[in-house]
Amino acid sequence: MINQIQKTISVCIIGRPNSGKSTLLNRIIGEKLSIVTPKVQTTRSIITGIITLKDTQIILYDTPGIFEPKGMLEKAMVRCAWSSLYSADLVLSIIDSLKPLDDMAHNILNQFCLLNIVPIFLLNKIDIESKYLNDIKAFLKISHPKSLLFPISALCGKNVDVLLKYIKSKAKVSPWLYADDDITNLPMRFIAAEITREQLFLNLQQELPYKLTVQTEKFEELKDKSIKINQVIVISRESYKAIILGKNGTKIKDIGVKSRIQMEQLFCVPVHLFLFVKVHALWENKQEFYQYMKI
């Protein structure tokens, strides 16, 4: 039997908040691995996705959006995003083609030059007509002449196959780091916490989702192969608890049901989910929470 030649490539996806990084990762992997919401700064840590295409294993890093950080948490998120560049063979800079390049976008482009990084630019959301697309293309061709440009739609999948073909062509002969059916190296308890946090983002209004985090305290496989999950929603103020619980606990029950359904779809087994709310003043200043969030 002839051993298959294995190739590997690591790819970092970086860009502004809500530019489509997580949507692209999910599209490529074929599973909803990275949470997606309309709110900015949803992704807080590096989410690793893995896809193996015949002889080539592609390891993708979805990163927090780049923005002007203020508090300790935001600074850690942005620092985490930039640090991912150093472990990647290829950098994909995703740009929202529906918006003009703003000051932060130009700062990111300048940073690539300072770091001697030649990114691949992905002009995302081309499924919607944009009056800025041609101007963005023209600017990038002048400012980064060595970089390739791929107009794509991460949401609809347009040109993602072309992008994957290019990524695959850049892979080098190297043993795979993961099994050929792995889609991530993240612990299931971490993924479960992210799923619940996504539902909190989607179901809580205004700024409250940014003031909380979720930790999986118990992840137990039962004899019938179902999973029991205990999670704690950590908030910084007592006044937030009533909002999360809702009248007679209806809000947290609804969030729990939606989270459980997504977990069952991803884990392919029944899930028993129990949610608790805990007040932990100034949790954003505690190192233990950053270690749990992997930032």
Curated annotation (Swiss-Prot):
Domain (Era-type G) ranges: 7-176
Stretches the record annotates as G4: 124-127
Transmembrane segments annotated in the record for this chain: none
Membrane topology reported for the UniProt record: Peripheral membrane protein
GO biological process terms, semicolon-separated: ribosomal small subunit assembly
Zinc-finger found in the keyword field: no
Subcellular location, record wording: Cytoplasm; Cell inner membrane
Segments of this protein annotated with the region G3: 62-65
Binding-site residues for GTP, renumbered to this chain: 15-22, 62-66, 124-127
PROSITE patterns: G_ERA, KH_TYPE_2
Family matches, as Pfam families: KH_2 (PF07650), MMR_HSR1 (PF01926)
Tree of life domain: Bacteria
Ranges for domain KH type-2: 204-281
Keyword field: Cell inner membrane, Cell membrane, Cytoplasm, GTP-binding, Membrane, Nucleotide-binding, Ribosome biogenesis, RNA-binding, rRNA-binding
Region (G5): 152-154
Keyword Secreted found: no
Subunit structure: Monomer.
PANTHER family documented for this protein: GTPASE ERA, GTPASE ERA, MITOCHONDRIAL
Similarity field: Belongs to the TRAFAC class TrmE-Era-EngA-EngB-Septin-like GTPase superfamily. Era GTPase family.
Name of the protein this chain belongs to: GTPase Era
Organism encoding this protein: Rickettsia typhi (strain ATCC VR-144 / Wilmington)
